[in-house]
């Protein structure tokens, strides 16, 4: 069929299949703003276009509908090198993070302002209601529109976007646009899907329909015979190598309990076979031709089921230890299943697979018996959290190709270096033969720390020699991604009558699902990032992680802290009620203070024993709680309106800024011939603005404009090793490596500048904009670089920095919530939510606020509406964004504020600490304690629903 239509003002004539999906059609025409985030359901809005004057989801159209249509995409906004009014406002406000659906947002807002000169909040919410944004938290979009409206009348107009910090510094703590924001909002090619070549093969995966089963028969011959099928991968022809999907530093503190394909299916969605074909359509047709028979086994779906004496064993294969094998290993293995499979454990992590225990650890300080004996009151409560999904706007995706004898991996990953190490081992290549290019990442939130499809894609390319694309559908994100661990946490508190704690005991039990990636470290962070908030002389913790047959779990932003913090905060609040003490008052009496030693962290490691006992070197909780109390009007009356009851709640929170003594970051900076700089950073910017942090740190040290610094990051050929984007490590680790590299280069520039000026080094200094200034005059960086590159020069000037540390940098914060609960219907309305955070010196204030809003809204979603639900046989019923319940713009609190409260930390660069992860840690307990304040009930399992409210009120 030949169709005629207008695309961004240009007439088009195309021969198409009448039923061809318009999103795919436009994307293949180069309209990269029209993306697919939700399997064509039109829920996410990443595919928004203007169709005959109306915003429409392109995925919901077929090609035949384009006949005589007028189509506009985000490519019509601005010019190739000039942002439109709305795009510029988005960049200036700092709303662009992962950027994946920001072109769609720009198009929708532009259309709104073309129709309504000054839209109300309700009109804004309505216009953006069809857009899904997992990272930005929505609040800053109101600022975008405010700024765009102001600039319509006055192009030079500004609004108050974010405060500034550190008057003694030039660029740190000041507004500066995110370095990659412009190309993202303009939809310039920067994601994996934008790099895929036309000749690429496609992978489609046949997945298990059973939660627990053995493959008894597998025949792929008919699929292999289908024209266009290039290869089929199964357990019969994949590498016989065991690994963990978790992208962590080696040796990994997780069981190596996965083979690329196995005989045993351990969850609905587990891998059966991968078809590599010349088109998606052929691959899908080939999947139907694969013959599989299963022996269906009883699934294990919960912690309690996993603990049962007669529980089915999820991992019944033999175990091999690299070091530290237990005395019982030979006897345990004598009862193991002999299928030719095994698992490997690098070092003791308390694993007992025959008991469904993936990992466990125990520790304590002080004398627990004495602590509880000294208590005037003792309480013990159990709290539960359910499974939640990261929902990155861009699903998992990988594109692999050969470059001569080298494997090139274009990946949407948080850990390019760990990815290279893992894949090189699996495909039997040396690391220098594997080139990982981390493209822009359309959202990660921990899920892209795990290696979930890259190894299959790489193996397919190595076997066939063909370029290969493997992209998860949204359904695969729910059944084959790694989600948040289910947890059951019991807290026992002993206290004096005045509320001061004498003993704290936490029993943290986690459900890791079918594989043990992060099974030690995520649950360990439950106590590690909650117990130190309330220092006590007598503390005991037990962590036990169980295998089951729910869909996989792994790294999710917060990394165990939200579950531990929910339990300790709720238990303390219940203690306060029993003692008739105000919740905020009991927090004040027990909370951590600046300079205080955090003794319990001397007993909790993350893959290895701690080398020292850290302290809270910087902590702004005193000021945070003062401001929060005033903002929420903590002690003011709470009016009642019929069935609606008002309540207020609070939670204090903490996080780490990297993993001392385990992780490392490196950086190299080159002085270019004209005096500008190129930074080769190993860090992985996944939308957090890390490249901008590195830019500003280099500019601050080198006294040059940030515009003179360009960052190349996350490319294993063109940067030095970095652990990757996890554990809130970017600013402290990658940032400090950049600072050290800049300082190293600064000394070289000063030395050669002094020589050129004929002065002692002690008499010269760097000065903005990019000169060495002495008593006799000054010389520019460009002149120094040129001198070095001459035939009699000293060579190119390069600075390097390597950062490791034994020290912790802890960001702190508090969340304050005000809710209204309808005691007749159970409805919960979150009216106010204030997130106040101490991230040290905010390097990028407007980006920091965006990180807080995004993380906080994800936490609100986890608390109010999000959960993966299963039937009795282990089939996940939640498989798309429409049914999952992640919040959109209409779900945010009416009064939603993020506040930066600075401190000065000795570990981070220029006093900075992490910001992106801590924001998810406090919403659940803040909301739950507010619900109790409103109607007197304790909800000990989150998320919170009207049914749970009414059940607790004994109305159903």
Swiss-Prot record:
Its cofactor is [2Fe-2S] cluster; Mo-molybdopterin. Keywords: 2Fe-2S, Iron, Iron-sulfur, Metal-binding, Molybdenum, Oxidoreductase, Purine metabolism, Purine salvage. It is an enzyme of class 1 (oxidoreductase). SMART domains: Ald_Xan_dh_C. Signal peptide: none annotated. Gene3D superfamilies: [2Fe-2S]-binding domain, Aldehyde oxidase/xanthine dehydrogenase, a/b hammerhead, Aldehyde oxidase/xanthine dehydrogenase, molybdopterin binding domain. It comes from the Bacteria. GO terms for molecular function: 2 iron, 2 sulfur cluster binding; iron ion binding; oxidoreductase activity. Mo-molybdopterin binds at residues 414, 445, 727. InterPro entries: 2Fe-2S-bd, 2Fe-2S-bd_dom_sf, Ald_Oxase/Xan_DH_a/b, Ald_Oxase/Xan_DH_a/b_sf, Ald_Oxase/xanthine_DH-like, AldOxase/xan_DH_MoCoBD1, AldOxase/xan_DH_MoCoBD2, AldOxase/xan_DH_Mopterin-bd_sf. Belongs to the xanthine dehydrogenase family. Probably has no xanthine dehydrogenase activity; however deletion results in increased adenine sensitivity, suggesting that this protein contributes to the conversion of adenine to guanine nucleotides during purine salvage. This is Probable hypoxanthine oxidase XdhD. It comes from Escherichia coli O157:H7. The gene is xdhD.
